[in-house]
């Protein structure tokens, strides 16, 4: 198996790790015309409890 020939310096390690960034979650508007709150896609709306305009959770 290949192994590194030299130890990677601290500055090279940190500059390589600087490219790793956390991505913001994608938000969409709820399909319920009465709600329209931002929510995660493909997830039941936590505000009104609907999914694809169908009531799923009873509030």
From Swiss-Prot:
Highest classification ranks of the organism: Bacteria, Bacillati, Actinomycetota, Actinomycetes, Acidothermales
Gene Ontology terms describing biological process: translation
Protein name (Swiss-Prot/TrEMBL): Large ribosomal subunit protein bL32
Signal peptide: none
Annotated family: Belongs to the bacterial ribosomal protein bL32 family.
Keyword terms, alphabetized: Ribonucleoprotein, Ribosomal protein
GO MF term list: structural constituent of ribosome
GO cellular component terms, A-Z: large ribosomal subunit
InterPro entries: Ribosomal_bL32, Ribosomal_bL32_bact, Ribosomal_zn-bd
């Amino acid at each position: 198996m290949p192994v590194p020939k030299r130890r990677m310096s601290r500055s090279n390690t940190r500059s390589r790790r600087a490219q790793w960034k956390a991505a913001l979650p994608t938000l969409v508007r709820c399909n319920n015309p009465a709600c329209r709150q931002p929510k995660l896609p493909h997830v039941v709306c936590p505000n009104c409890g609907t999914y694809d305009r169908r009531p799923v959770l009873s509030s």
